[in-house]
């Protein structure tokens, strides 16, 4: 296949900035996936100060990357509180992988539920899980004559894991703002779920530095890092390389392309652009449009049920 002029330029760009063949930008993470706006530092303080108001913690992670989407700093802050982990977006994650994660958490003494907060699937198990996790608190309240006292949970997680969708489902009213982009909820809010459960919603918060570049990659793949601070073309190339190594059949089936084995990300992106007819003046590939399609369709689960990490 003859690579187009623009394809050739993009290939050079990719080699320099993505592969580190020229010592200008040594790795993907340092250039594209580091995002910690000022309000997140404030959020960390608010979470720490609010812990004495709750009995337990609900952490929402992305079922496709449970480890990478769990903020280690939040984990350290809330470790003394009973915790429930919601593996959200499990509808687009590999079900076998999700089952392994649930078993993993169980061995750690943590209750984990596979859910889809937008549709509500799996959330019928949430209230019983709350009462099971805080059975000792319920018993103490009853002995003190406060059997009707609500159990309070703080809801935490990184941006774009589905906290607002969860709150809306459980509160029964569309009170929390829902948008498929990182960094929407910006203040602590209380919501009642009924059944004696109250939830304290908190804004999504990342941590200042991703020590493992692959963690930064994965967070950008699922949209937990704002697209406006990433290079979407470079990001899509990296995503395609990861998926080509693990799920090549899904790429070929979704985009009606073949022979991607051994190709670099930009080459696969070019194939996708041609097949989809993403062209600009002169018949050149519109890489920006192709990149947006790849990232959006992965996030929406249109390539199939994919998990990017196992316990």
Spell out what each predicted region is.
Residues 19-56, 64-73, 77-83, 90, ...:
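Helix-rich effector regions associated with P-loop NTPase G domains
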Residues 117, 167, 197-200:
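Conserved active-site beta-strand-loop modules that form the wall/rim of enzyme catalytic pockets
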Residues 148-150, 173, 188:
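Short coil/loop residues immediately preceding or within conserved phosphate-binding loops
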């Amino acid at each position: 296949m003859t690579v187009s002029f623009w394809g050739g330029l993009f290939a050079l760009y990719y080699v320099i900035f993505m592969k580190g063949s020229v010592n200008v930008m040594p790795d993907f993470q340092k250039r594209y996936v580091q995002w910690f706006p000022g309000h997140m530092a404030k959020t960390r303080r608010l979470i720490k100060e609010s812990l004495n108001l709750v009995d337990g913690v609900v952490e929402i992670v992305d079922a496709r990357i449970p480890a990478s989407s769990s903020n280690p700093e939040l984990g350290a802050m809330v470790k003394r509180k009973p915790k429930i982990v919601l593996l959200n977006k499990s509808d687009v994650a590999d079900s076998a992988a999700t089952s392994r994660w649930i078993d993993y958490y169980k061995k750690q003494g943590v209750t984990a539920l596979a859910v889809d907060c937008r549709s509500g699937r799996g959330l019928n198990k949430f209230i019983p899980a709350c009462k099971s996790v805080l059975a000792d608190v319920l018993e103490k309240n009853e002995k003190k004559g406060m059997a009707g006292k609500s159990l309070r949970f703080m809801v935490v997680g990184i941006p774009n894991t589905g906290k607002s969708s969860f709150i809306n489902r459980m509160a029964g009213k569309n009170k929390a703002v829902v948008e498929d982009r990182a960094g929407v909820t910006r203040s602590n809010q209380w919501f009642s779920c009924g059944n004696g459960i109250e939830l304290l919603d908190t804004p999504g918060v990342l941590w200042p530095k991703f020590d493992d570049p692959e963690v930064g990659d994965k967070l950008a793949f699922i949209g937990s890092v704002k697209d406006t601070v990433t290079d979407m073309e470079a990001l899509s190339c990296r995503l395609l390389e990861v998926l080509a190594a693990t799920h090549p059949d899904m790429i070929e089936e979704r985009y009606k392309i073949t022979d991607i084995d051994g190709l670099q990300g930009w080459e696969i992106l070019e194939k996708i652009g041609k097949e989809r007819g993403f062209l600009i003046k002169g018949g050149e590939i519109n890489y920006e449009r192709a990149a947006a399609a790849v990232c959006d369709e992965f996030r929406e689960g249109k390539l199939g049920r994919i998990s990017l990490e196992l316990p």
